[in-house]
Swiss-Prot record:
Range of residues in the leader sequence: 1-16
GO biological process, one term: bacterial-type flagellum-dependent cell motility
Organism for this UniProt entry: Campylobacter jejuni subsp. jejuni serotype O:2 (strain ATCC 700819 / NCTC 11168)
InterPro entries: Flag_FlgI
Gene from which this protein is expressed: flgI
Keyword field: Bacterial flagellum, Periplasm, Signal
Name listed for the protein in its UniProt record: Flagellar P-ring protein
Assembly behavior: The basal body constitutes a major portion of the flagellar organelle and consists of four rings (L,P,S, and M) mounted on a central rod.
Origin superkingdom: Bacteria
NCBIfam families for the chain: PRK05303.1
Length: 348
């Protein structure tokens, strides 16, 4: 049975959030790390002989242990070549643990149950900042039927790397403090300026544009103390609506108030008609969804006559038709492309 999981986010239009939830401190950011490694111990689900780089990597690894093996003589399918990625947080210290993502490069069928061998993770400057190693489990990434296929060739390993090198920071001596909004918005930038100047009783904040707020630290506070107080302040905030679809698991996450404009879309054999001016009553083949929507399984058609149609309504109706997560993703993308969805669409 094909199943789509739908999560609805219940929220008011405007609510209070802390500044740290909507803005970042410029210069305080994650850094991307990457490395190449081998996963061993796979039960015949590793790379085949067509993945020449894997065979060469095995040979190089063994040669480093004084064991000489010609890559052409290696027939094992218990090893897979992988790329390992991680984020190094700002102010991370030597010995801290990092989560890593391990992704197959070759034709391995699955990484489940394997072990990632010692892998150096480097920054863009080529320096080693972390070392990864550990057991692989892809349990959380098994897709539902009708999904985009197996993703057991990728896995996230919690705490799979140790930080070996710290990135130098001079935050305490930095006199140029700036907030960068995660989503550009003049109203939010203005709210931050107004709240901070009110709290500190002086002109400590100046909104430069829709994304940038310059800060001026009071002389009696350190940078750390000042930013701690700044980031914990509450402001009025209206978030941008968003629809998130996890194509690996077939999960849709959407706010209950994400509206869809009138539109007619056909995808494969599925037709969607959204027309609030159509007062046609349900025919004998249609199922009344009790929310202004009707589903006709005989023709794979859904129509919505309600004045307010939402992503949640459409997702439920598509699920009723038995649409696969692949179909859901394609339809949502087409709705967004047609300008019918008033929200950001994110595929993860």
């Amino acid at each position: 049975m094909r199943v789509l999981t739908i999560f609805l986010l219940f929220m008011t239009s405007i609510f209070a959030v802390q500044i740290k939830d909507v803005a970042n401190t410029v210069g305080v950011r994650d850094n991307q790390l990457i490395g190449y490694g081998l996963v061993v111990g796979l039960n015949g689900s590793g790379d085949g002989t067509s993945s020449k780089f894997t065979l060469q990597s095995i040979s190089n690894l063994l040669q480093g242990m004084n064991i000489k093996v010609d890559p052409n003589d290696i027939k094992s399918k218990n090893t897979a070549a992988v790329m390992v990625t991680a984020k190094l947080p700002a102010f991370a210290k030597s010995g801290d643990k990092l989560d890593i993502t391990v992704s197959s490069m070759g034709d391995a069928k699955s990484l489940q149950g394997g072990t990632l061998l010692l892998t150096a993770l480097r920054g863009i400057d080529g320096e080693i900042y972390a070392i990864a190693q550990g057991s692989i489990s892809t349990g959380g990434l098994t897709p539902r039927p009708g999904g985009t296929g197996s993703h057991s060739t990728a896995a996230t390993v919690m705490g799979g790397a140790n930080v070996e090198r710290e990135i130098p920071q001079n935050f305490s001596q930095n006199n140029d403090l700036t907030l960068s909004l995660k989503v550009a918005d003049f109203k939010t930038a203005n709210n931050i300026e107004r709240v901070l100047n009110t709290v500190f009783g002086e002109e400590v904040a100046k909104a430069i544009d829709s994304r940038t707020v310059k800060l001026k630290k009071p002389e009696d506070l350190s940078n750390v103390d000042f930013m701690a107080r700044v980031l914990e302040q509450d402001i009025a905030y209206k978030p941008q609506s968003k629809v998130i679809i996890d194509e690996r698991t077939g999960t849709v996450i959407a706010g209950v108030d994400v509206e869809v404009e009138p539109v007619l879309i056909t995808h494969k054999d599925i037709t969607i008609k959204i027309d609030p001016n159509n007062n046609t009553v349900a025919n004998q083949n249609e199922i009344d969804m009790k929310d202004g929507g009707f589903v006709d399984p005989s023709s794979n058609t859904l129509r919505i006559n309600n004045a307010k149609s939402t992503v949640a309504n459409i997702a439920r109706m598509l699920n009723k038709l038995g649409a696969t997560p692949n179909d859901i993703i394609a339809i949502m993308e087409n709705l967004k492309r047609a300008g019918a969805i008033n929200a950001d669409l994110e595929i993860i």
